[in-house]
Structures are given as C-alpha cells and as structure tokens.
Amino acid sequence: MRFLPALAVVFTVTLATAACAADDANRVTVFTASSLTDVVDDLAERWETAGGPEVVAVLGGSNHLAAQLRDGAPADAFLTADAELLNGLLSNPAPADLVRGFAYNHLVVAMPSDGPGRNPGDLHNRDLVLVACAQGVPCGDATWARFGDLPVDSYEPSARAVVTRLDLGEADLGIVYATDVAARPGLVQAWPHDPACPCVAYAAAALTDRGRSFLAFLDTPAARDVLTGHGFVTEPPS
C-alpha cells in the first residue's frame, strides 16, 4: 500500500504512462477522496491479502481528482464523495464500472477534546473561530444544505483541511465528517449529533479491468467490515 498526494500526479503522468506493463500489472492506482484517507489503507490491506495487486492511493479532494482524470491522469479506479463527478468520466459504462453508494457519511460539528462545552447556538457565536469546507466540494455543499448560512471564518478545500485546522488549535469549531472525529482522539463532537441527512454517498468508477476488480471487492463482506469499522454506514440511510 502506497500513498501519493494528488499534486504528485501532475508530475508523474509521463513516467507512469511510460512504465512497463509488467510493473503496472503489480499495482492498482486508486484516486481516493481525502475523507477516505483513514479507511483506504485497511481496504488495501484486505484486498492485497486476498491476492489483489498493491494499491497505490492518490489522495485529494474529489473535485481536484476528477479534474486530473479528465486531463488524462492514469488511474484504475476513482473513489469520490460526490457521485455527480462520475458523469462524463466514462462513455457508455457497463454496470460493473460504477458503484454508487458503497459507503455513507454524515456531518458533525467537531472541536478539540480539551475545549469547553459547546451547544448548537455556538455556530453563530462570533467570538469563536468556525472553520468549514468551501462550497463546490462535497463536504461544503453538504454543510450548506444542512446548516445554511453560517459565520464561517475560514473555508477549506476539504474536510481533512478542516481537521488540520482543529488539530493545530487554529479553530474552536469545525464542520467535518463523523468518521473524521471517530479517527482522532484529539477531537470530539461539540455536542451529540444524531446521524442526519443530507448525507454524503461515496461512489466509485472503474477505469480499467483492474479497477473493475477493485470495485467488485468493495461489495464484499470483507470491505464492508472495514468500512463500518471506521464509522461509515454501508446501507442507504433511511
């Protein structure tokens, strides 16, 4: 299992496309939404244990990754937090080329675990620093749909970037995915949140035969166990 930042793709396209076929056959490149960072390593481990080739995960915001794919960046599969980004990536896709809703996530308001108690009214407290995702990326669109207009102090390009601001002590509150909080002992939900929609439905596209095999793996009990173990839901929310 290897990770690459999304920006690295820009500089490695030529080298990747020139790599020998035998080398390519020993790995599967998966463009992966940054909100799946914590789970993709375990998914790759299960996949590789079952005999699949090494996974090279290219991590980044869903919109940014989709743009790179449209510009010709080589990949075998694309895991996105925005199913709409799959439109136009494939021409006449077969059913096995697309998986919509292999996992679901929802938003929570997070804060550093050593912070004082908060309540929903604090979202409009101008004395607190509130960080959220920018509109136009999946977490930002979901934030707007759920919470409406908020006095946000800093808009970030991804939920991971919001988490980083919280980790660094640069924000009092941040709107992130429930799985982000579950993965970090230093963060807690600012107040109890019941799972609520609008939810984020993760989707996947296969761009090669190896990618198609990886998508089939996502629909196995082993993959679902990994996803639920990281706090994702694998059935559509009611």
Model-derived regions: residue spans:
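Exported/periplasmic ABC-transporter solute-binding proteins
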Residues: 20-50, 63, 67, 82-83, ...
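A short beta-strand-loop structural module common to alpha/beta enzyme folds
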Residues: 54-63
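Conserved beta-strand scaffold positions in the cores of enzyme catalytic domains, especially
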Residues: 57, 99, 189-190
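Periplasmic-binding protein-like
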Residues: 76-80
